């Protein structure tokens, strides 16, 4: 019984950490600019349909930005989210 509770607690903690907004690069410095269509660019973690909607990282050599598909446990499927990540990371 104790091991089952430990496994469930670990799984719940993993879901909370992996689903956190900072995992999309929200803490990485980025430029919030007005797009040609008059709207502001979308910050990391926001829904998107194409990469041109997403805000770009200030350091474009180290970081890459764009719209990527990620699993959402809350919505029960894949969603497109703006994301900024380190170019050298295997998660990018």
From Swiss-Prot:
The keyword Secreted applies. This is Toxin ICK-17. InterPro entries: Cys_Knot_tox. It comes from the Eukaryota. The presence of a 'disulfide through disulfide knot' structurally defines this protein as a knottin. One of its GO terms (cellular component) is extracellular region. GO terms for molecular function: ion channel regulator activity; toxin activity. Belongs to the neurotoxin 21 family. Probable neurotoxin with ion channel impairing activity. The lineage of its organism: Eukaryota, Metazoa, Ecdysozoa, Arthropoda, Chelicerata. The keyword Kinase does not apply. Disulfide bonds join 41-55, 48-67, 54-82, 85-92. Pfam families: Cys_Knot_tox (PF17486). Expressed by the venom gland. Its main location: secreted. It is found in: Secreted. Keywords: Disulfide bond, Ion channel impairing toxin, Knottin, Neurotoxin, Secreted, Signal, Toxin. Residues 1-19 form the signal peptide.
């Amino acid at each position: 019984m104790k091991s089952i509770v430990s496994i469930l607690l670990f799984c719940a903690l993993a879901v909370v950490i992996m689903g956190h907004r900072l995992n999309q690069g929200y803490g990485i410095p980025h430029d919030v600019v007005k797009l040609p269509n008059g709207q502001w660019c979308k910050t990391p973690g926001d829904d998107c349909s194409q990469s041109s909607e997403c805000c770009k990282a200030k350091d474009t050599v180290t970081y890459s930005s764009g719209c990527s598909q990620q699993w959402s446990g809350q919505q029960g499927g894949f969603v497109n989210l703006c994301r900024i990540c380190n170019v050298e990371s295997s998660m990018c």
